[in-house]
């Protein structure tokens, strides 16, 4: 069975997903007028605006922190380690490329989610890919298919991957029994997810910035302490990225392929651009300024923080400790722990264990919120179905600590590809709407006015929207 999963992965990620992700990212980069570069100077202002509370939804900052909670998981640690193990230091460069290109894709999917959001019976905004497939494309069957993929991925598999990383870290540092790890983590997860969307969002708006700052500051201090090695480490990333070192031996093509494949895979698992997960958090926000593009820009910040800051920090630690080769026999998170033990002394591995627990716990909780959101689309938002999902998440967390690492990542990669193919197909079909959103936002910015989305200006789009999602805005 592992060989079968490996074969499926090689087909999907050997060519299909790489071309699709790269092509979609380039398309939306051009279609939105290089949105990730145009508004990069606005990131600070967008973060400031994101704190404004608005009726009917989360603040944009709460939405960002919820999406970051899902993004900033073991993929930022174990995923980076796996990418370097399989693809060499050059995988880091391709993670950067995937992140920059993915920012445009994320802008597209999150803007669409914000545009096609609707209110539930409690007045809370709900939305995501399933909604824009149903409303924007008129293909509810496609939305149902995506929602099922997401429930499998975020309700089951991805939480198991995060739990697996926690177990690996605790086993390496303290020889902790896997079953005990799983039960404790599952209990804390259950306590958190019963708080609901608003409760989780309030928890994450304080929790996520704190854990990210701890990891990044620690990494910066270590980099400064080893500043003499940094030029060599940075050069090794670029040298390996293009196969220059292996060219003389005739292995450049294979090495380049491995670097690109693993860089794109791990970047996507970490920042989730194009996968269709982040739009579930983006749609829950009452955006400020009241324009879909504003939420798209805020969520681009999440990719910048996740991959270009946190993942890069993890990569630097691994490469500083062993130039990407010394500890290759170790798997995933244990490679990071060994690197930190080399760089920080005996307590380095224990510090990584703490960080992994924080990252993985926040990710599991946010994963559940995404899955629960799609129960609403499937009209299964009754107490029985919700508690069934909670129990399933509880069991998956325990099970994740007992399964092997390669199997967990193979399953994650396959379901991630299924989600991405469905979502990317939808947003590419909706690219004229994305272009309209980006152009409308830019037009108002050039006029020097606060961007406000008015559905009456675009009647073809307005007819597709939920009646009460943008009514207040159009009346301003």
Regions inferred by a protein language model and the residue ranges of each:
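N-terminal alpha-helical transmembrane segments of multi-pass membrane transport
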Residues: 1-74, 84-91, 102, 398, ...
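Membrane-interface loop-to-helix entry segments
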Residues: 20-27, 31-44, 164-170, 176-238, ...
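Alpha-helical membrane segments and immediately flanking helix-loop junctions
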Residues: 54-85, 112-130, 134, 151, ...
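Extracellular loop-to-transmembrane helix junctions
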Residues: 6-42, 85-123, 305-313, 349, ...
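Transmembrane helix-loop junctions in multi-pass membrane proteins
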Residues: 17, 31-36, 75-80, 89, ...
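Flexible loop linkers connecting adjacent transmembrane helices
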Residues: 34-59, 82-92, 96, 104-137, ...
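Extracellular/periplasmic helix-exit of transmembrane alpha-helices
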Residues: 29, 107-117, 220-236, 244, ...
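Helix-loop-helix module between adjacent transmembrane segments
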Residues: 27-29, 98-123, 129-193, 354-364
């Amino acid at each position: 069975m592992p060989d079968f999963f490996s074969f499926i992965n090689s087909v999907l990620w050997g060519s299909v997903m790489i071309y699709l992700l790269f092509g979609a990212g380039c398309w939306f980069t051009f279609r939105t007028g290089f949105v990730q570069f145009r508004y990069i100077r606005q990131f600070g202002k967008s973060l400031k605006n994101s704190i404004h509370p608005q009726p009917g939804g989360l603040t944009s900052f709460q939405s960002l922190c919820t999406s970051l909670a899902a993004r900033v998981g073991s993929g930022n640690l174990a995923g980076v380690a796996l990418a370097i193990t399989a693809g060499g230091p050059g995988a880091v460069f391709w993670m950067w490329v995937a992140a920059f290109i993915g920012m445009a894709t994320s802008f597209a999917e999150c803007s669409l989610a914000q545009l096609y959001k609707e209110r539930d019976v409690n007045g809370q905004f709900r939305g995501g890919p399933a909604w824009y497939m149903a409303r924007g494309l008129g293909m509810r069957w496609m939305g149902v298919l995506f929602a099922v993929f997401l429930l499998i991925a975020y309700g089951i598999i991805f939480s198991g991957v995060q739990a697996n990383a926690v177990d690996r870290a605790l086993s390496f540092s303290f020889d902790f029994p896997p079953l005990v790890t799983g039960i404790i983590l599952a209990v804390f997860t259950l306590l958190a997810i019963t708080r609901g969307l608003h409760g989780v969002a309030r928890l994450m708006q304080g929790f996520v910035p704190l854990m990210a700052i701890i990891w990044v500051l620690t990494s910066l201090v270590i980099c400064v302490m080893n500043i003499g090695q940094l030029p060599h480490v940075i050069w090794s990333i670029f040298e390996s990225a293009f196969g220059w070192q292996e060219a003389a031996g005739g292995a450049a093509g294979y090495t380049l392929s491995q670097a690109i494949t693993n860089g794109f895979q791990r970047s996507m698992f970490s920042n989730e651009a194009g996968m269709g997960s982040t739009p579930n958090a983006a749609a829950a926000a009452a955006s400020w300024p009241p324009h879909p593009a504003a939420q798209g820009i805020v969520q681009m910040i999440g990719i910048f923080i996740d991959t270009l800051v946190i993942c890069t920090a993890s990569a630097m630690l691994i490469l500083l400790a062993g130039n990407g080769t010394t500890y290759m026999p170790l798997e995933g998170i244990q490679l990071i722990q060994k690197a930190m033990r080399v760089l920080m002394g005996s307590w380095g591995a224990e510090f990584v264990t703490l960080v992994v627990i924080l990252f993985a716990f926040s990710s599991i909780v946010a994963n559940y919120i995404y899955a629960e959101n799609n129960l609403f689309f499937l009209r299964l938002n009754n107490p029985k179905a919700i508690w069934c999902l909670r129990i399933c998440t509880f069991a998956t967390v325990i099970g994740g600590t007992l399964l092997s690492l390669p199997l967990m990542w193979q399953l994650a990669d396959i379901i991630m590809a299924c989600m991405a193919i469905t979502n990317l197909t939808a947003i590419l079909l909706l690219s004229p709407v994305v272009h309209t959103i980006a152009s409308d936002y830019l037009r108002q910015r050039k006029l020097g006015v606060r961007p406000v989305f008015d559905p009456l200006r675009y009647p073809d789009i307005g007819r597709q929207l939920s009646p009460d999602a943008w009514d207040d805005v159009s009346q301003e």
